[in-house]
Amino acid sequence: MEQALKQAGIAFDKNEVPVGAVIVDRLNQKIIVSSHNNTEEKNNALYHAEIIAINEACNLISSKNLNDYDIYVTLEPCAMCAAAIAHSRLKRLFYGASDSKHGAVESNLRYFNSSVCFYRPEIYSGILAEDSRLLMKEFFKRIR
């Protein structure tokens, strides 16, 4: 999660919403990809940290199935990212801060508990949550 927080810091410095993600090989615990939100620079609403990381990981291993990998993300995934996590079959999801506005894992939609979700990763929340929360708070304080 510390590496995901570093990625969130990079996003913060680029005036992107500070969310970072890393995907880790479960067998050797090595990070295979890391990413951060990039919606402003790319002018594309789809460039969330999770989507970028999943795309890069699939390209790296030449597979759409990431069942031997875990994702660490600093903020509770939105509906789009939760669906991408399910579709790519990541084994475990670790996230930091909850997102009361857009979170779709445990805060609002609860995507993985819905009837439309066909795959549910193991979910672990609250990891370094305060660090993530503070970074988000600073970011939105700065832009308002």
From Swiss-Prot:
InterPro entries: APOBEC/CMP_deaminase_Zn-bd, CMP_dCMP_dom, Cytidine_deaminase-like, tRNA_aden_deaminase. Zn(2+) binds at H48, C78, C81. Residues 1-116 form the CMP/dCMP-type deaminase domain. Its EC number is 3.5.4.33. Binds 1 zinc ion per subunit. Pfam families: MafB19-deam (PF14437). GO terms for biological process: tRNA wobble adenosine to inosine editing. The active site is at E50 (proton donor). Its cofactor is Zn(2+). One of its GO terms (molecular function) is zinc ion binding. Belongs to the cytidine and deoxycytidylate deaminase family. PANTHER family: CYTOSINE DEAMINASE FAMILY MEMBER (PTHR11079), TRNA(ADENINE(34)) DEAMINASE, CHLOROPLASTIC (PTHR11079:SF179). HAMAP family: tRNA_aden_deaminase. Homodimer. This is tRNA-specific adenosine deaminase. The lineage of its organism: Bacteria, Pseudomonadati, Pseudomonadota, Alphaproteobacteria, Rickettsiales. The gene is tadA.
